[in-house]
Swiss-Prot record:
Recorded GO CC terms: cytoplasm
Protein name: Urease accessory protein UreD
Keywords attached to this entry: Chaperone, Cytoplasm, Nickel insertion
Keyword Cytoplasm: yes
Pfam families documented for this protein: UreD (PF01774)
Subunit text: UreD, UreF and UreG form a complex that acts as a GTP-hydrolysis-dependent molecular chaperone, activating the urease apoprotein by helping to assemble the nickel containing metallocenter of UreC. The UreE protein probably delivers the nickel.
Similarity comment: Belongs to the UreD family.
PANTHER family per UniProt: UREASE ACCESSORY PROTEIN D (PTHR33643:SF1)
Taxonomic source organism: Klebsiella pneumoniae
Major subcellular site: cytoplasm
Length: 270
């Protein structure tokens, strides 16, 4: 059971995607509070590129964010963000973020948020769940920054719980949880950058290609393939290497998964 939360911003966003006129459209976007999206872009004609806008003031203890997205059969959506999500120091209350992404058969989701930055003293709990069907396609990443290493600031105190799940036809393929408390970072080898990338469905050939792309991260990166779910995990102390490797892996996997060449979201180039 979750602990009681101090009253803060209650923000919800529910997105519904459908096929219409030969392309994926955002059929519905219902939101409460300062959590919304920009108008969809179509740099690839039928594929919908959507920018999710987190609150500009960041996320503090007591805030609750709930994000859900449903993709109807045949949809292809790429969701990213203009900037990092920032979790600020808390006086004790917990910030809670729930993200639930549901894909119908033949739907494709590219979930590519910017990094989440946890300031020293933050108290945050995150749940991200992907519900797929056997014929859904998923390419997603999750990048956490502990402290602000670019200015020499570490996650010296605070609490972070990050839970990540992938379900296919109501069966769990991945259930993992990262739990960090009071500056104890031995479980992440004292590295400030923690990344996970997911690809479904994948093959042994894709696994081999991804492992080659992970070479710049040395011993602090690995990839595995279980029940067609390719999972990439890495740790680093260099955000530029992290971001470059993540994008390199995405660019390698995307044509195999979707049959489309990589098209960088315009916001990444600004």
């Amino acid at each position: 059971m979750l602990p009681p939360l101090k009253k803060g911003w209650q923000r919800t966003l529910d997105l519904r995607f459908q096929q219409a006129g030969g392309k994926t459209v955002l059929a519905s976007a219902q939101h409460v509070g300062p959590l919304t999206v920009q108008r969809p872009f179509y740099p690839e004609e039928e594929t919908c590129h959507l920018y999710l806008l987190h609150p500009p003031g960041g996320i503090v203890g007591g805030d609750e964010l709930t994000i859900s997205a449903h993709l109807a059969p045949g949809c292809h959506t790429l969701i990213t963000m203009p900037g990092a999500s920032k979790f600020y120091r808390s006086s004790g209350a917990q910030a809670l973020v729930r993200q639930q992404l549901t894909l119908a058969p033949q739907a494709t989701l590219e979930w590519l948020p910017q990094d989440a930055i946890f300031f020293p003293g933050a108290n945050a709990r995150l749940f991200t769940t992907f519900h797929l069907c056997a014929f859904s396609r998923l390419l997603a990443w999750d990048l956490l920054c502990l402290g602000r290493p670019v200015i020499g600031e570490t996650f010296s105190h605070g609490t972070l719980s990050n839970r990540l799940e992938v379900w296919v036809d109501d069966e769990p393929l991945l259930v993992e949880r990262l739990q960090l408390q009071e500056g104890e970072l031995s479980s992440v080898a004292e590295r400030p950058w923690v990344g996970t990338l997911l690809c479904y469905p994948a093959t042994d050939a894709l696994l081999d290609g991804v492992r080659d792309a992970l070479a710049p991260l040395g011993l602090y990166a690995g990839a595995s393939l279980t029940d067609r779910l390719l999972t990439v995990r890495f740790l680093s102390d260099d955000n530029l290497i992290c971001q470059r490797v993540m994008r390199d892996v995405w660019q390698f996997l995307r044509p195999h998964l979707t049959g489309k060449s990589p098209v960088l979201p315009r916001i990444w180039l600004t």
